[in-house]
Amino acid sequence: METIFAQSSSFGKAGVAVFRVSGTKSLEVLKLLTGKSNFKPRFMYYQKLTSPESNDLIDNAMVVYFKAPNSFTGEDVVEIHTHGSKAISIMLTNALLNIPGVRLAEAGEFTKRAFLNNKFDLTAAEGIADLINAETIMQHKQAIRQAGGALEELYNSWRSQLLRIISLLEAYIDFPDEDIPESVLKDVTNTHKTLINTISEYLNDNRKGELLRSGLKLAIIGPPNAGKSSLLNFLMRRDIAIVSNIAGTTRDIIEGHLDIGGYPIILQDTAGIRGESNDVIEQEGIKRAIDSAKKADIKIVMFDAETLDSAVNEDITGLIDENTIVIINKIDLIPENRIFNIENKYRCLKVSIKNNIALPSILKNIEEIAENMAGFTETPYITNERHRHHLKQALVYLKDFNLDNDLVLATEDIRMTMHRIGAITGIIDVEEILGEIFKNFCIGK
């Protein structure tokens, strides 16, 4: 394979910039850049870097050589740590490009080579990508567990059980006249039933892992002028929505990203929902608000305490479910002991966004719902639609398995189940999906 390189750190001004080189010419590249002939693997050296063509000094750098297979990619690898300067990065990149047999790496190519050299499986590679993209503590916990091989271990345990079924049955395929012993039939049947139940239950996870990976959508809905935009600004801790006492100020969906209790929340402030409007633009805003609420994982339904009874309508209450927080805003403007009809049906939070009354309770309720929907558990969840697709197909083959059928055909159902699970981890030939997975990595990883 060609020797590749890339800047693994961000391009720009920084304390340190890190370049990575991987391939058979890595050590030769290091010698050309430094003029030094001997490098002990896994030792850092302070060296002058010069351009092999012009002999111009590039920088004083720290360099280290990792000898195959004891490196991230499994190949010879060199890391070069320079000062974080755009000029230095450009000069070093040009110097490397001018060395024959060395080229710039494609996105995710270092991780792809590590996978091809059996450093980890595909689920761990995806975990590394998720770890790089993690923005919250809970996303980090899920990603680092996957990168550490938790999903690989789970899926391989299922493959091992399937392999055991095949090994038990294949012993009798060549001897069709012999009856399969009762003990073998019982072992196969029990393992088969257990796997069906285990994988079925695993798939019935309400997409918790995928929600945590992508973020939970939270739609703020309610009648006009209830304080929805003020709530969005409070949650975002900055003004991203226009706040006005004029009904219908918000026409389109305004979105913001938030970390609540370690859970990634995608906030959506929507247009006020009211029964009648002659404004075509406002009508479209209301339609989008309702659509947004229907697709949301969490909903906040907000009412103005002064106009609540007249503002409640089926368009709004019809959207309330178990993952909805009902908020009565502007309680500072009404008598303290007032009870609303809506409180007889739903648990409501009484707050004042403007006067900072009971606002922590909103954050607490959001976190509780998020934890219930995407909370961290001992068993690693499915984090990727690719895994779910293959597991569903595996379950189809597993359910088709029947010992009353021809033994060869029955064994083939188990083999196809193994094939589908192997496609998740990369045990089988999966060249057609590698490009799709690794293109989402950054250059230099």
Curated annotation (Swiss-Prot):
Cofactor binding note from Swiss-Prot or TrEMBL? Binds 1 potassium ion per subunit.
Per its record, what are the GO molecular function terms?
GTP binding; GTPase activity; metal ion binding
Q: Which PROSITE patterns match?
A: G_TRME
The entry marks the following residues as binding GTP, namely 225-230, 244-250, 269-272
Name its GO BP terms in alphabetical order: tRNA methylation; tRNA wobble uridine modification
Ranges of residues in domain TrmE-type G:
215-371
Its subcellular locations are: Cytoplasm
Pfam families documented for this protein:
MMR_HSR1 (PF01926), MnmE_helical (PF12631), TrmE_N (PF10396)
E.C. designation(s): 3.6.-.-
Q: Assembly and partners?
A: Homodimer. Heterotetramer of two MnmE and two MnmG subunits.
- What's the name of the protein? tRNA modification GTPase MnmE
Kindly list the organism's lineage.
Bacteria, Pseudomonadati, Pseudomonadota, Alphaproteobacteria, Rickettsiales
What's the encoding gene here? mnmE
